[in-house]
Structure formats: structure tokens, C-alpha cells
A protein has these predicted regions:
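Short, acidic/turn-prone active-site loops that include or flank metal/cofactor-
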Residues: 37, 42, 99-106, 160-162, ...
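Short loop/turn motifs at secondary-structure junctions
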Residues: 72, 184-187, 354
Length: 448
């Protein structure tokens, strides 16, 4: 094979909950370089979740880009979690905490009744932030802070902006809605379509491109585009999407458009991902969950800071049921991963959609006990994506669009690759099923 021209490389940067990740990728989707810059997830109170936005949203992306050492990259694009918000000064530097999804300062009444991710959370973030820093130069979400740090352009994509409803009405910033929260249009970032050129990265010839929401970036390169394809995003947040032929509403779940024409996705986000599993890892003695006895596993309720889909209950809390003297640290750790798998299965069953295959993506795919628990809990093989940095990979594809190397977003599916397939284990099927039924009863699921 002829060597790939260095001119063909683009870069995707993902501002995540626990780290900024960056990948340099060629036209075939092969990763030539990667970087990960960790940052702290701050929990100043049980119902609060924030970043030091200077560290996580500004310094992290710039450092990650520098670590790749590819100043010749054709373009760079940023993906990020939503919603998020901070106030910035005239130099684009954050001056308030970086508020993150699920923080009580964005709490919206009746969120459980909404068929899409909660509308209004970002607006409540703005209300709090504007009161903390009235007259700030700007009120920006994470991608605007990162893009300004990279290229001096405070810009976000339309999908990110739409999550700010009612602040953004689909055509532009709503002056009246902003005024109600203490802000003006000129304090908000510019909004552009994803995959468009919007600037030049400092110190390079690279074009800055608009990226997109992290989950969207992961989805376009996952290959979960056919009816019954399930995408499980294993990050700090656990996200499950089932591809369906037509949109329909399911109580407790979200329905959103798919990037594939004529398709929709049903599912949602859960706190039973890395946020919960990381806490378990810190408080439970080290042991190998793969060595646990299938008959000696308790049941975790993984609601360490409330739950999103399908309950939308910020006041739920974690609990451990059925602990006895025959169990050990391996049993407790297996129970935690199993709880995450139970959440996946519950969302699949609530959706009522036929399941064809399960594809897992995200940093958690490196954790084999997690992948095994999802396979055991669902009773289905789990296809593990070859590139764990799925959001950064998708952003790199959008960067290609900005410089004319790609024209159709659905072509990103050619970058989908499976590293391994994790099969459910026969000796775990019956005991795991029994615990799943107990999990549903304890959680008050309407599947009982």
C-alpha cells in the first residue's frame, strides 16, 4: 500500500467529562496519532457537576492538539458533551465554573414528560451563570471556549445550539429568552452548520471546522445505521440508541432523528456509566470481576446521582441489595458492571424495537468486564468499535468535510470497524436473568 500523504490527515478533538481526547486520522479512518489530557470532574455538592473550564475546555484541547504534533493537518474540529456553560472575559477565558449536564443549577420541571433530552437545562445554566457574572464578555458552552482557544473563533454547531432551546430557536438566538436570563445576543457564540470552515488554527495552516455534539460524532462513525442496530456509548454517561424505521414516542425514552435518511433513534442517557463505575472502582477493593461466581453476585441500583432515562429522577440514589458473606470484591465489582448492562437491556425492552446487533463505542470499551457484563445482561454479542475515541473520530470526519475532502455525512460509516466481539457466557445466562428481574422490581420499572 502506498504511504498516506501527510496532507490527508485531519484532527478531531473531543472535550469529554474526564479528559480531552484527540486523534489524527487519514481518509480511511486509520488513527495515526492520539492524545488524552485528563481533567478533574468536580462534584462540589451531591447535585452539582462542573469543570474548571479553563483547564478542561481551554487548556486541555490546546494541549491535546499539541501532543499530536501534526501542524500540517488539513483541518481540526471539536466535539463536546451537552449542555455545558461558563462565563468568559474579553480574552475568552472562563471566569465561572463550567456547568455540566445534570447539574441541579439547570434543573427543569417536568423533564420526564419530554420526548427529547430536557429542553431548558442550558437556559437555567445561563440564568445562574449570568447572575454570577453579570456583564461578562460572553456566555459560552465548552466547544465555543475550545474553538476560541484554538483559533480565536467562539463558534458552535447548530445541533449544540438547538440543545439550548428556548435560547436558540432554530434560526438564531432568541433575544427575549436571553434577556429573561440576563444575557444578550452579542454575548452568545456564533452558530454554524457542522463540517464548515470557520477559522484557522493558531500557529498552523489547519482550518478550524465546526464539530458537533459528542454523541452525534460517535454515531456517524459507528455503523449503527440499519433498523435494529443498537449503539451503546460507554463513557462517563451511558447512552443507548436503537435505530428504528420511523419516529415514535416511548414514555421515559427520547426520540431523535438519525443522520441516516428516514431513520430515527429511540433511547437515552443514563448515569450508570463511567460516573458510577468510576466511583465503585474507588471505593471497592481491587479484584477481577471476570473471576466472580455467577451465583454469588448482589444487585446494584446504580443511581449514584439520580437517573436520567427512563426515570428522569434526580433524587434517586444508589443502593446495594442481597449482599451476604459468600461474596467478595470481585462479586461487588461484577454487580456494578452488571447494573450498567441491566440499564442497557431495560432501555432496549422499553423501546419495543427489534434488536439486530449491539455495537459499543467510547472509552469504556477498553474495560473488558464492562463489555462482558453488557453481553451477559442482554444475552447478545457485543461488537466493540476499533477506535475507542469515537467522538474525536467523528469530529475528524467533519473536519474533512470543511476542506472538501468529504461531502456526505453518511459516508462516515465507512470508518466503522469492529475490534472484537464479546459473546455472552452460557453459565451466566440464568443467574443474570434472575438478577435482572430483581433489578426491575427494585427500580420500579414499568416492565415488571
Amino acid at each position: 500500500m502506498a504511504p498516506v500523504s501527510r496532507e490527508d490527515v485531519t484532527i478531531g478533538i473531543d472535550v469529554g467529562t474526564t479528559a480531552a481526547k484527540a486523534v489524527a486520522v487519514d481518509e480511511s479512518g486509520r488513527v495515526h496519532a492520539r492524545a488524552r489530557i485528563p481533567h478533574q470532574l468536580l462534584v462540589p455538592a451531591p447535585d452539582r457537576l462542573e469543570h474548571n473550564a479553563e483547564e478542561a475546555w481551554r487548556e486541555g484541547p490546546v494541549t491535546a492538539l499539541g501532543r499530536l504534533n501534526r501542524p500540517d493537518a488539513k483541518a481540526v474540529a471539536v466535539s463536546s458533551m451537552v449542555p455545558s456553560l461558563t462565563a468568559v472575559d474579553t480574552e475568552g477565558r472562563p471566569i465561572t465554573p463550567g456547568l455540566l449536564y445534570g447539574d441541579s443549577r439547570g434543573r427543569v420541571p417536568d423533564a420526564a414528560e419530554q420526548p427529547v433530552p430536557a429542553v431548558g437545562e442550558a437556559a437555567e445554566f445561563l440564568r445562574w451563570t449570568a447572575a454570577e457574572a453579570p456583564g461578562a464578555a460572553g456566555y459560552w458552552p465548552a466547544p465555543a471556549v475550545a474553538n476560541h482557544a484554538l483559533a480565536g473563533e467562539a463558534v458552535i454547531d447548530f445541533a449544540t445550539a438547538i440543545t439550548s432551546l428556548p435560547l436558540f430557536d432554530g434560526t438564531g438566538w432568541n433575544a427575549s429568552a436571553l434577556a429573561d436570563r440576563g444575557a444578550t445576543v452579542d454575548q452568545m457564540p456564533r452558530v454554524e452548520t457542522f463540517g464548515k470552515p470557520v477559522g484557522q488554527v493558531r500557529g498552523t495552516s489547519s482550518v478550524l471546522a465546526t464539530g458537533a455534539i459528542d454523541a452525534l460524532c460517535e454515531q456517524i462513525v459507528a455503523g449503527a445505521d440499519h433498523d435494529g442496530d443498537v449503539l451503546v456509548l460507554c463513557g462517563t454517561t451511558l447512552i443507548v440508541w436503537i435505530t428504528v424505521a420511523e419516529a415514535r414516542q416511548v414514555p421515559g425514552l427520547w426520540t431523535i432523528p438519525h443522520t441516516a435518511v428516514g431513520k430515527s433513534q429511540i433511547g437515552g442517557a443514563s448515569n450508570a456509566g463511567g460516573l458510577f463505575l468510576g466511583w465503585v472502582d474507588r471505593v471497592v477493593a481491587q479484584a477481577d470481576p471476570l473471576g466472580a461466581d455467577p451465583r454469588r453476585v448482589p444487585v446494584w441500583m446504580p443511581y449514584i446521582r439520580g437517573e436520567r432515562t427512563p426515570f428522569h429522577d434526580p433524587d434517586r440514589r444508589a443502593a446495594l441489595h442481597g449482599v451476604d458473606l459468600t461474596q467478595d470484591a470481585a462479586s461487588l465489582r461484577r454487580a456494578a458492571y452488571e447494573a450498567s448492562g441491566f440499564v442497557v437491556r431495560q432501555i432496549l425492552e422499553l423501546s419495543g424495537a427489534p434488536v439486530r446487533r449491539i455495537i459499543a463505542s467510547g472509552g469504556g470499551t477498553r474495560v473488558q468486564p464492562w463489555m462482558q457484563a453488557i453481553a451477559d445482561a442482554t444475552g447478545r454479542p457485543v461488537e466493540v468499535s476499533a477506535v475507542a475515541e469515537g467522538a474525536a473520530l467523528g469530529a475528524a470526519f467533519l473536519a474533512r468535510m470543511a476542506v472538501g475532502l468529504e461531502s456526505v455525512i453518511t459516508d462516515a460509516a465507512r470508518w466503522a470497524a469492529v475490534e472484537r466481539v464479546v459473546e455472552p457466557r452460557s453459565e451466566w445466562v440464568r443467574p443474570t436473568n434472575d438478577r435482572y428481574r430483581h433489578f426491575l422490581e427494585l427500580s420500579g420499572s414499568r416492565l415488571v
